[in-house]
From Swiss-Prot:
Any GO MF annotation of the entry: metal ion binding
Gene3D superfamilies, A to Z: 3.10.20.30, P-loop containing nucleotide triphosphate hydrolases, TGS-like domain
Example of a GO cellular component annotation carried by this entry: nucleolus
Cofactor(s) it depends on: Mg(2+)
Residues reported to bind ATP: N32, I33, G34, K35, S36, T37, L231
Domain TGS: 304-387
Binding-site list for Mg(2+): S36, T56
Name listed for the protein in its UniProt record: Obg-like ATPase 1
Locus of motif Nuclear export signal: 267-274
Xref: PROSITE patterns: G_OBG, TGS
Binding partners and assembly: Monomer.
Predominant location: cytoplasm
InterPro entries: ATPase_YchF/OLA1 (IPR004396), Beta-grasp_dom_sf (IPR012675), G_OBG (IPR031167), GTP-bd (IPR006073), P-loop_NTPase (IPR027417), TGS (IPR004095), TGS-like (IPR012676), TGS-like_dom_sf (IPR023192)
Length: 396
């Protein structure tokens, strides 16, 4: 039975954020809340984790493998010579303080580090420890969220005012009709962010033209945010802490739809020093589990990233692409010749491959697809690209 041809996918709408796949997610929060400890555990690196503000001056950056059972299955099946998973780029950014947008602490430098990131792990402290000072004097994660929220908004306010001043001179007083639509959109952004004191991402109905303008400026408050609550090991295991409900209520009211993930930096740090067997035994005894994999996967998805697989005895590899990527551009991730000479993508769904067991069986079951240049690649697709070169037709 010949492979089936499928219809081209629907038109994709633009996404707020930087286009590309080398995207970063930054760990943001006040000083002394466990950011560097979390970064060390997440990346298994040894960034300084001292007990004083601003111990992280230059942002530490690391690549973290994205856990995926599908990748592990393909590696076990093919037993390849090379295994390359997808990676999440994580940046540990020094603690912000109240007044950072006005230059307090090392505020301007830190805010520029956030600007270079594409998403935010907003870390907050919900544990008491007399040995670890809190920059605000006491533990109150809801207050801490408000501080970070306002500092990011104030920095965007500066950018919006400066942009509008420039646009008004050219588009309004100068009569440049080409820039008038951008001026009108920025006026709407000003109303939302400055007058109504919201974050850009709180508004979910920006149209395509508005998103194009937002992506020109890449405001801090447009970046996707995941809220991470750092608990004591005791509170995390028993799933009880007086701040959990208060934080969830704040997020539901102010940033609806955003994810809130409780974790314990101390627990994760302790688990890191254990063997796999000791770790499993400890977690079973405590009737709890690590959430690091969940945090990594959530951060990767928040950047609007996904991946397809190429798989065989030589290599199993996850290729990172932006959601909505068409087949020729996905092929170009492997080699520019694949995109230039693209003929088709031969696609298997992972679940079909796992169920049928072999490529031949997938074909025999009529589940093997030939896709054209308008096909939108889906997360977990297993793809073989056919392409032309000046010499001959090739296949990977």
């Amino acid at each position: 039975m010949p492979p089936k041809k499928a219809d081209d996918g629907p038109k994709q709408h633009p996404i707020i954020g930087r286009f590309g796949t080398s995207l970063k997610i930054g760990i943001v929060g006040l000083p002394n809340i466990g950011k560097s400890t979390f970064f060390n555990v997440l990346t298994k690196s040894q960034a300084a984790a001292e007990n004083f503000p601003f111990c992280t001056i230059n942002p530490n950056e690391s690549r973290v493998p994205v856990p995926d059972d599908r990748f592990e299955f393909l590696c076990e099946h093919h037993k390849p010579a090379s295994k390359v998973p997808a990676f999440l780029n994580v940046v540990d950014i020094a603690g912000l303080v109240k007044g950072a947008s006005a230059g307090q602490g090392l505020g301007n430098a830190f805010l520029s580090h956030i600007s270079a990131c594409d998403g935010i792990f907003h870390l907050m402290r919900a544990f008491d420890d007399d040995d670890i000072i809190h920059v605000e004097g006491n533990v109150n994660p809801v207050r801490d969220i408000e501080i970070i929220r306002e500092e990011l908004r104030l920095k965007d306010e500066e950018m919006i005012i400066a942009a509008l001043d420039k646009l008004e001179k050219v588009a309004v007083r100068g009569g440049d009709k080409k820039l008038k639509p951008e001026y009108d959109i920025m006026c709407k952004v000003k109303t939302w962010v400055i007058d109504e004191k919201n974050h850009v991402r709180y508004y979910h109905d920006w149209n395509d033209k508005e998103i194009d303008v937002l992506n020109k400026y890449l405001f801090l408050t447009s970046k996707p945010m995941i809220y991470l609550i750092n608990l004591s090991e005791k509170d995390y295991i028993r799933k009880k802490n007086k701040w959990l409900i208060k934080i969830k209520e704040w997020v539901d009211k102010n940033d609806p739809g955003a994810l809130v993930i409780p974790f314990s930096g101390v627990l994760e740090l302790n688990l890191q020093d254990m063997s796999d067997e000791e770790k499993q035994k400890y977690l079973e005894e405590k009737m709890t589990q690590s959430v690091l994999s969940k945090i990594i996967k959530t951060g990767y998805a928040a950047l609007q990233l996904e991946y397809f697989f190429t798989a065989g005895p030589d290599e199993v590899r996850a290729w990172t692409i932006k959601k909505g990527t068409k087949a020729p551009q996905a092929a170009g991730k492997i080699h520019t010749d694949f995109e230039k000479g693209f003929i088709m993508a031969e696609v298997m769904k992972f679940d079909d491959f796992k169920e049928e067991g072999t490529e031949a069986s997938v074909k025999a079951a009529g589940k093997y697809r030939q896709q054209g240049r308008n096909y939108t690649v889906e997360d977990g697709d297993i793809i073989f690209f056919k392409f032309n070169t000046p010499q001959q037709s090739k296949k990977k």
